[in-house]
């Protein structure tokens, strides 16, 4: 089993991503996850 997590808001430092940053980084995470899943299927 493999888990890939992305954090957009920190409860400790109160930092958060803008909507655009969240969209961009989540898209990157999804692409990476799909690439990894394809590699694991080989």
Swiss-Prot record:
Positions bearing the site annotation: Important for catalytic activity: 22
Active site annotation, chain numbering: 9 (proton donor)
E.C. numbers: 2.4.2.1
Function: Catalyzes the reversible phosphorolytic breakdown of the N-glycosidic bond in the beta-(deoxy)ribonucleoside molecules, with the formation of the corresponding free purine bases and pentose-1-phosphate.
Family of this protein: Belongs to the PNP/UDP phosphorylase family.
Name the UniProt record assigns to this protein: Purine nucleoside phosphorylase DeoD-type
Quaternary assembly: Homohexamer; trimer of homodimers.
Class of the enzyme per the UniProt entry, highest EC level: transferase
Keywords: Glycosyltransferase, Transferase
GO biological processes: nucleoside metabolic process
GO MF annotations, alphabetized: purine-nucleoside phosphorylase activity
């Amino acid at each position: 089993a493999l888990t890939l997590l992305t954090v957009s808001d920190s409860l400790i430092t109160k930092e958060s991503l803008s909507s655009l940053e969240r969209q961009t980084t989540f898209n990157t995470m999804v692409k990476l996850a799909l690439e990894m899943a394809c590699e694991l299927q080989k």
